Amino acid sequence: MSAGSSSLPVTTIYGLSTEGYKLASSIALKGAKVSLVDDSAGMAISLKPDLARTYPDVNALIEDGPLLAVEPTDLAINNAAYIFFAPRIRKTGHDVKIDVASKFQDAVKHVKKNSSIIYTVPTGFGTNSENIALIEHITGMTMGKDIFYYYMPANTIPVSNSDLHIGTYKARQDSQLAKLLSTNDSRKKINFVDIGSLEILHSIRILGHYSGMASILEICRYVREGQTTTEITKGSFNEIYLDDVASGLYDLRAIGASLGGSSPLMYLVNGTIKSIEAYVKHLIDETRMMLKKRDLKASRTKVTIAWTMDQNEMRGDKLDLLSILEARLKDYIGEVETQHGSFDFYPTEKTMMVIACSKADFNNIVKRNINSDLIVIRATPISQTLL
């Protein structure tokens, strides 16, 4: 243990996710004792500073997982003064809430008195109050007296203000937590705010991001062949790829799930979600239209969905959309595959069609396959095609 590490509390991160590892690595490099729980294995990895320096991300860590020192999950949580809840979420629909609640109960039942729980999963309105009630029920402790709770939603939406906001129970300030989360960037401040206020701030950020996007997706569905002028296709709004649409979808659904009854906000959230679902259908229709326009037979065509994504990020919405897109394309086209990372396409007897789901993927495909006969479709509001 390094000098100065004795001033930092023992910390456990629950969840072998990209966000969880980023937290664990950052805290370990400060010299704190850190454990990283793999809930699927029921074990915790002891993350020392040298390991945090060796493994740049969770993918590299997972590859060498069997070689790392581990301890039981209950012991890692019980020894910790601070427990960050950052699991990988892979369930969808109504199963999401049950899955997250199950993981949270697993983390909470082993906490000790005077420990602090930091919930990093984005929520809607009132979910944190439910979490607090659950903690008190499971542990028998009193919130704010025997145990403490914070809300720190992991953010995927770019923000102009780089300050970190942490929701606290009864506006409690925590200098130790601030130390664990501090960075070398003097411009980034840590602000403790009321939990309810942070739920509102996060919801405004998500809805502000998606309301404009949903409007673009809906309007662009009215663009017909022959109307795709340079002004339309070169517009910045046509740089919205499927990857961008999926980035905060979990958060949007969480907000919708927390709303009851009928209200303008409920209609706004549900309408936005339906726009995204319609966008996926539109992409499939565009692919089918391309086959028809070029007089291509589905049996003689191979479609590759090119979408490079982080397989271990907390939210599973990109994987879910990828699965939906792949399944629906297979209803019309016999051979459909997914690829990520390096895109090298070799000649085959079939016509090759590639759907680029992010700007980085599109640029990579074009760069690596300059002389190829690929048909490349950009997964944007106005799906442009390159041959």
Say what each PLM segment does.
Residues 41-47, 125-130, 312-318, 361-365, ...:
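Short, charged/polar "capping" segments at the starts of alpha-helices
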Residues 61-116, 343-367, 372-380:
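Rossmann-like NAD(P)-binding element
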